[in-house]
Amino acid sequence: MALKHFNPITPGQRQLVIVDRSELYKGKPVKSLTEGLSKKGGRNNTGRITVRFQGGGHKRSYRFIDFKRRKLDVVGTVERLEYDPNRTAFIALIRYTDGELAYILAPQRLAVGDQVVAGNFVDVKPGNAMPLSSMPVGTIIHNVELKPGKGGQIARSAGTYAQLVGRDQGMAILRLNSGEQRLVSGACFASVGAVSNPDHGNINDGKAGRSVWRGKRPHVRGVAMNPVDHPHGGGEGRTSGGRHPVTPWGKPTKGKKTRSNKATDKFIMRSRHQRKK
C-alpha cells in the first residue's frame, strides 16, 4: 500500500503523511472474534499511574488474533484484509474449509482469495505456517514462537521479519531485525513472509492531536518539571539538568544496560550490540 501526502490547506496537513488504507475492508470486524477493551489510562489495579503519558484515545474493540496457527492441514481462504487499531500490522480474516473463522497477521503479498495452510510439510509461501525444522534455510519469516505451542512472539510489528540462517542440533538459528542471531527450538512454528504495512515507519502524524487519538498524551521532559517531580527538575531559567541523564526514579538512562535475564543468554549467538561487520 502506498503513502498519502496532502496539500497544506491546514497546518496539521502540511507535514501529514499516512498509509493509504483504501484497499482494506471498510466494515466492522467479526463480532465473535472481538471483545470489549476498557481504557486503563496507564493505571494499575490500585489506580496508580504505572505508565506515564497514556490516556484518552478513540474507543477500540480487541480482535482475537491466532498467533499459534495450530489448525493443521486445514486450508483457509483469505476473506478480507482489515485494519486493526491495536497493532501496526494489518490482519487477514481466514475462512477454513470446515467453516471456522480466524484472524491472522497479514503478511506482505497476501491478497483476498489466497489460500493459506498450517502444517508440518506445506508450501513455502506467504501466510503459511510450519515448524522451523521444516523450512528451507534462508526463508523470510514472521510471528515466530520462542516456545513450542506458546504462540508467535517475534516479528509481529508492521514490516518486520526474521530470517532462518541455519540449523544446529535440533535448534534453528534466526537473524532478527535488530541484527541479533538467536537459537530457537526447531519445533517452534513460524509463518512465512514479512509482516504487512512496511510503510508504517514512513508516516508523519502532522499534528499532536493524532497521537492523542491513539491514547498518547504529551511526553514531558524532566528538565521542564519541578524538583518534586523529577531529578532534572528546577533551576533558575532553562537548565541542562546538571547531572547524567536519569529516570524519574533516579536510575541511569540513555545507554545504561538493563538486561538481567541470564537464563536466555545461551540462546543468543550474536548480540544486537556487536559491531556490524
Swiss-Prot record:
Q: What cellular-component terms does GO give this entry?
A: large ribosomal subunit
Swiss-Prot/TrEMBL keywords: Ribonucleoprotein, Ribosomal protein, RNA-binding, rRNA-binding
Q: Which PROSITE patterns match?
A: RIBOSOMAL_L2 (PS00467)
Q: What's a BP term from Gene Ontology annotated to this protein?
A: cytoplasmic translation
Q: Which InterPro entries match?
A: NA-bd_OB-fold (IPR012340), Rib_uL2_dom2 (IPR014722), Ribosomal_uL2 (IPR002171), Ribosomal_uL2_bac/org-type (IPR005880), Ribosomal_uL2_C (IPR022669), Ribosomal_uL2_CS (IPR022671), Ribosomal_uL2_dom3 (IPR014726), Ribosomal_uL2_RNA-bd_dom (IPR022666)
Q: Which HAMAP family match?
A: Ribosomal_uL2_B
Quaternary context = Part of the 50S ribosomal subunit. Forms a bridge to the 30S subunit in the 70S ribosome.
Which function does this protein serve? One of the primary rRNA binding proteins. Required for association of the 30S and 50S subunits to form the 70S ribosome, for tRNA binding and peptide bond formation. It has been suggested to have peptidyltransferase activity; this is somewhat controversial. Makes several contacts with the 16S rRNA in the 70S ribosome.
List the coiled-coil residues.
none
Q: Which gene encodes it?
A: rplB
Q: Which SMART domains does this chain map to? A: Ribosomal_L2, Ribosomal_L2_C
- Family named by the database record: Belongs to the universal ribosomal protein uL2 family.
* Parts of the chain that traverse the membrane: none
Q: Which GO terms describe its molecular function?
A: rRNA binding; structural constituent of ribosome; transferase activity
Which residue ranges does the record annotate as region Disordered?
Answer: 222-277
Q: Which organism is it from?
A: Brucella ovis (strain ATCC 25840 / 63/290 / NCTC 10512)
- What is this protein's name? Large ribosomal subunit protein uL2
From the broadest rank down, the organism's phylogenetic lineage runs:
Bacteria, Pseudomonadati, Pseudomonadota, Alphaproteobacteria, Hyphomicrobiales
